């Protein structure tokens, strides 16, 4: 694996998921137990999908280690904010633990790839 391969792979995966959510909001809404019949819910899911697409692409194409670290930090911050927002929105619902685990887990996975950006 070449330098920065791990964050690039994580970036491509993130971008792919983001595109899937942007095109089909139910990919995000369904596991949360929300219907995708709601126009506002679909719009919010699409916004999150587009954000994930953009941040994933930033990780996939970052040319320098500092740029990659910034892209990773943005991705991790997005995942952690998703954990907070979904945790609050799903309070008292069975989907809450899974949503928090998925968002925090993905954030930690992306954070772990930062080691690949270290030189020397």
Regions found by a protein language model. Name each.
Residues 1-120:
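Short amphipathic, positively biased membrane-proximal segments
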